[in-house]
């Protein structure tokens, strides 16, 4: 069905877990910017090509993890914050982490943080960003060589991305939703809050940015956000009742 030029499709199924999808717009295969997960992005540092084996996943709303879960009441003035990069931090943890580079690996660091007195962690971008985008030259244009190296990895993730999806390369399993929620539950169980960094470049739609933060707050129980970039409306975020 549609309203004007806006089309919508309703899928009636007991479970959408087994299905994946993409869009094809003017002959070009593209991913849904509102996708809740991506299949085909499990390996970090691999160039992102939207037309090759990358598909969107539906949200698995049947995941468990919130039984008896209570968010820690960490006041700002009493916060002892540990900022980290999911992959880099757990890769360097050596003997302390068996699931290196992953959200699950972070849960193994909880005893260490408690020993330090940490009551909040801040994750550098952990949504699905493209660390090695493929820049295809436009048809009919000459390829101009520059000094920019090809396939340079954006290790830190401060770029646009799929803001509703946990980064699958940071997961030890094929269940990103379950693993991220498990991490949040374990943090909260031990009195540690989780804050996420989001980078919204200037071209980002402000309403989309708001919806993304609301989703992570509601579905993943993230405790707060450190928002960067120019692609969001500060007043809109400050006035929002969910955040």
Which residues fall in each region the model found?
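Hydrophobic faces of well-ordered beta-strands that scaffold small-molecule active sites
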Residues: 80-82, 121-123, 194-196, 225-227
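Aromatic- and acidic-residue-enriched carbohydrate-binding clefts of CAZyme catalytic domains
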Residues: 95-102, 133-189, 200-219
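Conserved, mostly hydrophobic/aromatic
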Residues: 23, 84, 113, 123, ...
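The feature marks proteins involved in alpha-glucan
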Residues: 2-85, 90-97, 101
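Active-site-proximal helices and loops of the catalytic beta/alpha 8
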Residues: 140, 158, 212-214, 218-243
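Active-site beta-loop-alpha junctions enriched in small/polar residues
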Residues: 126-128, 199-201, 230-232
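Surface-exposed amphipathic alpha-helices with a cationic face
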Residues: 111-114, 181-190, 237-242
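Catalytic domains of carbohydrate-active enzymes, especially glycoside hydrolases
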Residues: 108-127, 219
């Amino acid at each position: 069905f549609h309203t004007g030029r806006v089309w919508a499709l309703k899928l009636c199924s007991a479970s959408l877990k087994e299905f994946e999808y993409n869009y094809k717009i003017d002959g070009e295969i593209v991913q849904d910017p509102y996708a809740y997960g991506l299949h085909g992005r499990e390996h970090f540092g691999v160039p992102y090509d939207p037309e090759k084996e990358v598909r969107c996943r539906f949200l698995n709303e049947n995941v468990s993890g919130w039984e008896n879960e209570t968010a820690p009441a960490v006041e700002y003035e009493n916060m002892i914050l540990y900022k980290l990069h999911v992959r880099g931090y757990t890769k360097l943890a050596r003997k302390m982490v068996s699931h290196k580079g992953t959200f699950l690996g972070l849960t193994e660091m909880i005893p260490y943080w408690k020993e330090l007195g940490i009551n909040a962690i801040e994750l550098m971008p952990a949504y699905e960003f493209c660390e090695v985008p493929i820049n295809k030259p436009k048809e009919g244009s000459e390829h101009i060589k520059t000094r920019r190296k090809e396939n340079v990895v954006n290790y830190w993730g401060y770029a646009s991305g799929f803001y509703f999806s946990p980064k699958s390369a940071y997961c030890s399993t094929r269940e990103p939703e379950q693993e991220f929620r498990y991490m949040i539950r374990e943090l909260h169980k031990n009195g540690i809050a989780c804050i996420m960094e989001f980078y919204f470049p200037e071209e980002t739609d402000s309403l989309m940015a708001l919806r993304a933060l609301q989703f992570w707050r509601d579905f993943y129980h993230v405790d707060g956000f450190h928002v960067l970039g120019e692609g969001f409306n500060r007043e809109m975020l400050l006035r929002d009742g969910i955040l």
